[in-house]
């Protein structure tokens, strides 16, 4: 999907229309987990082995990482080391293309900021999940009054930064939790 929707369209004239250069596609080794360190070795579309640190990061102002696993954390470190801006997007399909990527991110950022300000300083939050059988499960997350963070999807200006797409989330790192959560994830 990334090849069709991004690489081919960029190569078929979108780069020229935008007044940009680049638009190449590279593959890197799967990390098999979100936000894990990425191996330095990568490959171009002809299969030539390259180095992310030597051949990719220093050569581009903007990097879009479309992958199976989130690369936001490792690329945030690399963007500060090498001075690029970019976005990560794990999981790409028609639903995301036609919804989460088809919105005005200035409005998304504004809405997320309102929620972030309202939730900053909260000691705890409680979330109720109603299941298909009308049973309600409650999870309580303890936040210790921390400042809420937001994923706004924007990287304006020249400051090295990585956005996570699609965006609009407001999030915390809970210090503890109690209750029931209806989904289970592997470690």
Residue ranges and their predicted role:
Residues 183-187:
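Internal helical hairpin/lid segments
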Residues 1-180:
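Active-site bordering "gate/hinge" segments
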